[in-house]
A protein has these predicted regions:
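Divalent metal-coordination and catalytic microenvironments
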Residues: 28, 62, 84, 111, ...
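N-terminal small/polar loop signature for handling phosphorylated ligands or for N-terminal nucleophile
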Residues: 10-11, 25, 29-31, 35-80, ...
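Glycine-rich, Lys/Arg-enriched anion-binding loops that position phosphate/diphosphate groups
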Residues: 133-217
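Structural motif
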Residues: 15-16, 61-63, 210-214
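Gly/His-enriched, cation/cofactor- and phosphate-binding structural elements
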Residues: 4-10, 56, 184-293
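Short alpha-helices
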Residues: 87-156
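A broadly used, surface-exposed interaction patch
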Residues: 67-95, 100
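Di-metal (Zn2+ and/or Mg2+/Mn2+) metal-binding site signature of metallo-dependent hydrolases
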Residues: 16-24
Length: 293
């Protein structure tokens, strides 16, 4: 196994391409600053994406590695802590004292509370949690989330919003206003993406699939799930390695169950998986047109 080396004593792994993961990493950076190595990681990671953990202080945020990997790392690292909230990972890591789960909080909120105990979370973290748990209970969450999705899912984006938060209500009001204007455009994109949906068989389940940019995957997936006879919608994202899958179900645990069959996991109604190139071609061989009823 080929892994990268770092001179830093702290390694922070976090869920890549995810605003919740970025928020968790930002919370860690507020504590460790440049003393830590921040490494985004996804379920289709390769060994060369990882750092050698021997003698390091290791944190895994809004993400979990397989149990076999963590059981090796705990013997090599100076310390190891996993903070996650994905149901499939919780089931797989049951009994590991260094793996902490809270299904009622997002990864960003868990990281903030873990690294800054007793300090109220910034609004940007509260908004990230509100969307990640798909609650939308806070005023402005939809608008701010829409604005943030025009930027990369990164620590810098979270930090930029935090600076506006510190600047006061007027500065945040500008971001909310921009987000409100963006929401109409997002809905148009969702409508366009769902209009291209097709049926396909994925691990024995007939699902509705389409492609779209990752920024609107949750909205499109949820829309597909409502249209799908199996109540499952899948967003396919292609790369040179294969296809990433954002899976959504209209209630229940269908998304998570299917994601686990695709090497991933997540929550009951929202999860992610992966297909290599050969598996993706097999999926496409089963594709048929879809016409909404």
């Amino acid at each position: 196994m080929t892994m990268r080396e770092t001179k830093k004593d702290i390694i922070v792994y976090y869920h890549a391409d995810c605003m919740d993961g970025a928020g968790a990493a930002w919370a860690a950076r507020q504590k460790f600053g440049d003393a830590a190595e921040y490494a985004p990681v996804n379920y289709n990671y390769k060994s060369e994406d990882l750092f050698c953990v021997r003698g390091k202080e290791v944190y895994v945020l809004d993400f979990s590695f397989p149990r076999t990997v963590l059981e090796i790392w705990i013997k090599q690292a100076k310390s190891l802590l996993v903070l996650d909230h994905h149901a499939s990972a919780k089931d797989n890591l049951t009994g590991l004292p260094y793996a902490v789960f809270d299904m009622n909080k997002s990864g960003a909120m868990m990281a903030w509370e873990g690294f800054h105990p007793g300090t109220e979370a910034p609004m940007v973290i509260k908004h990230i949690q509100d969307r990640d748990l798909w609650k939308f209970e806070l005023p402005g969450t939809r608008e701010l989330s829409a604005y943030m999705r025009t930027r990369s899912a990164s620590m810098d984006t979270v930090g930029f919003v935090y600076l506006n938060e510190r600047a006061g209500e007027k500065a945040m009001g500008v971001l909310y206003g921009l987000g409100e204007a963006i929401l109409d455009h997002i809905q148009a994109q969702v409508t366009e993406a769902t209009s291209r949906a097709f049926k396909a068989w994925l691990r024995g389940t007939e699902v509705l699939c389409t492609t779209c940019c990752s920024d609107i995957a949750s909205e499109v997936g949820s829309a597909l799930a409502k249209l799908s006879p199996s109540k499952i919608g899948v967003i396919v994202s292609l790369s040179h390695r294969g296809a990433g899958l954002s899976i959504r179900s209209d209630g229940g645990t269908g998304a998570r169950d299917l994601a686990e069959k695709c090497g991933g996991g997540g929550h009951g109604p929202a999860a992610g998986g992966y297909l290599n190139r050969e598996e993706f071609f097999e999926l496409m061989h089963t594709a048929t047109p879809f016409t909404p009823a």
